[in-house]
Regions:
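Membrane-anchoring hydrophobic segments
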Residues: 57-60, 69
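Glyoxalase I/VOC metalloenzyme domain signal
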Residues: 2-28, 32-52, 68-140, 147-227, ...
Length: 319
């Protein structure tokens, strides 16, 4: 395994801005697909996350008509940097996104979405085109939001998606945060568990070379390593690509029910001992990965392992 503390070239997620500028690419959020939002909420609240109210998602009609139902709805756990999203199909809907979500749940419950944020959505669209991803038309996603003073507002995102077969690992997308100040409101950011930032995600795949190369073309960022574990460092955040054997080395006890599999999300704690104490008092067990990183089992985190690391460690590690 790499000497994680020697990874000084990597900027800790909590030290980076909330949204990128120029050609920078950040890991914006990751998403769970779930069949039961109530059960999910109980699980995540036990881990110390505050969840936003459930909202059915809508796309803006390009012809100026009423909003178009996306077929899915979400709740979010906002962090000081990045966030976690939890999605379920809206009952009675039949849309491409609801069908994709239900098909993914047939494979496994857990992480199925990774979203990168950019500043230049038009430039990112052209990059996806030139990379051979045949991106779909940009989606102007809107959802209502209640502000801290009780007034209503609307948050906006420009989302770039590609046909599902282009990125079979899950719903992999680019987006521009049009209203970041509304998305990251201070009163909805949980602090009791000490977790402050989204650091990365670990994917278990059959062909590490092919998948890492494809994600490199998708993001425009380079790959480290050439074996059965490789990594891709963004301007904020990192992805790790592991074979089944590499997953067993890095995350003992975590097994992929199928491949491809988004195995773990990595979260930075501002004070690991505080996080560990909070989880222990909540009845959630953790196992040590190092002196500066702990693991929450998928059983306790709605199907995905959660790695919590502090400022002296970096997860996923650089290959």
């Amino acid at each position: 395994m790499s000497d994680l503390r020697a990874d000084t070239a990597f900027q800790a997620p909590a030290d980076a801005p909330q949204t990128p500028s120029g050609n920078a690419v950040f890991l914006d959020h990751v998403g769970w697909f779930v069949p039961d939002m109530e059960a999910l909420a109980a699980t995540m609240e036990k881990l110390g996350f505050f969840l936003t109210p459930f909202v059915a998602q809508h796309n803006a009609d390009p012809n100026g008509g009423p909003p178009i139902p996306a077929g899915t709805g979400n709740r979010c756990a906002m962090l000081q940097r990045g966030y976690l999203e939890f999605l379920a199909a809206v009952p009675g809907t039949d849309t491409p996104l609801s069908r994709q979500l239900n098909a993914a749940l047939d494979r496994y419950q857990g992480l199925h979405l990774v979203a990168f944020t950019i500043d230049d959505s038009e430039g990112a669209y052209q990059q996806l085109q030139s990379g051979g991803f045949t991106p779909l038309d940009p989606v102007h996603l809107r959802r209502p939001l209640t502000l801290g003073d009780g007034s209503e507002a609307e948050v906006a995102f420009t989302v770039l998606r590609v046909p599902p077969e282009m990125m079979p690992e899950g719903r992999v997308q680019m987006l521009r945060q049009e209203t970041p100040d509304l998305v990251w409101q201070d009163h909805i950011i949980a602090r009791d568990n000490g977790i402050i930032a989204l650091g990365g995600i670990v994917l278990c795949v059959d062909d590490v070379d092919e998948v890492s190369s494809r994600f490199s073309r998708f993001t425009g960022k380079g790959i480290d390593g050439d074996g059965d574990y490789q990594s891709l460092s963004l301007d904020r955040g990192r992805l790790g690509f592991a074979s089944r054997a590499a997953l067993a080395r890095y995350l003992p006890g975590i097994e992929a029910p199928t491949t491809p599999f988004m195995a773990a999300v990595c979260l930075q704690s501002g004070e690991l001992k505080k996080t560990q104490q909070f989880l222990s008092e909540a009845g959630v067990s953790t196992s040590p990965l190092s002196d500066h990183a702990s693991l929450i089992s998928p059983i306790d985190a709605a199907g995905a392992a959660i790695i919590i690391f502090d400022e002296n460690d970096v997860w996923p590690p650089r290959a």
